[in-house]
Amino acid sequence: MMEPTIHLRQAKVGDIPAILEIEQECFQEDSFSREQFVYLICRSKGTFYVVVEQERMIAYVSLLFHAGTRYLRIYSIAVHPDCRGRKLGQLLMERTIETALECKAAKITRSEEH
């Protein structure tokens, strides 16, 4: 049997329902709203990556460029509980580091909200 293929790509607005599902599974009452994800994907100064396996969204990371600095902030990162232990968080962190290098960030920071 073939192993499922995992893809890492930039998020699209159409991904929001699946992102919300992961968000609610991981953070429950502290989860972000649909409007917050629309902003993060469409209008923020940053980037948003998702991990997809067989057309199912299983993880994401939202990165923001901190205004007035050369800092890249991890705003939110989550892996669906059913998919933990598969190094998906590591994959997202590696992409975060690549993004920081590409944009010549001086530092990677994390949000205190999640």
Describe each region flagged by the PLM.
Residues 113-114:
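Conserved small/polar residues in nucleotide/adenosyl-binding loops
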Residues 106:
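Short acidic/polar active-site loop segments enriched in Thr and Asp
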Residues 10-84, 93-95, 99, 103:
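Acetyl-CoA-dependent GNAT
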Residues 6-8:
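Extreme N-terminal starter segment of soluble prokaryotic enzymes
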